[in-house]
Amino acid sequence: MYLLAPGQFMEATEGFLKDFAKIRTSGLSLRSTDIYSDFNKNDMISRPETEEILQAQLEKLAQEQELMIRCGGAYTFAYTQVMSGVASDCSHFRLANETVPFLQMVLHGSMKLYTAPINLASNSQTAVLRAIEYGMLPCFQVTYDQSSVLKNSEYTDNFASGYENWREDILEAYKMAQDSLEGLIGCGITEHRQAAQQVFATTYENGDVVYVNYNTEDVTVDGHTVPARGVYRERSGSQ
């Protein structure tokens, strides 16, 4: 992978928009919006300067297209409609006791949030439950052929990507997400708490509460029975 010199961002963006205008589409996905320095002695650019240049180009792109950005930093938030690859777990350093969805609570309602690929997680079922707990939409990264064809290539990180192997899991995950989060994607999160051992509750600004149970048995909490390894949604006004 080669990095484009920050000083070339403007020219590259203008050329891209000119060519891209020929394609009838309303959205654009940006793989990377990283900031970095350029130590060219004839045109040195610092990271803060790169950030300013990048924001100017994102503003141009956002005027023409809806933007999906992968793991964007705070400097991209104002221009992002969809963010993909959003982390849903902590580093698990020794001093970390719990994982808190701080980013999701800040951004939910202002943009759509998608997880990192569920099929590449160590436990796909837990990853789907965590996505729903955090109000995110599940993402899968699949290939038409079996992932074994990628052996000895530059794409060995897609170690479990064969679509036919994941088809039923994908349908089940999207069905669960739709039932649990329909109508909530545009709502802000007002509270996230642990309601019981391995049971978490996320409250949205419309009053709905989504309970996620990671236990292998049903749990009754706040007067509701949350199914094992499942979800219960308390709709605003329901008892």
What is each PLM-predicted segment?
Residues M1-Q239:
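Active-site-proximal substrate-binding groove within the catalytic cores of carbohydrate-active enzymes
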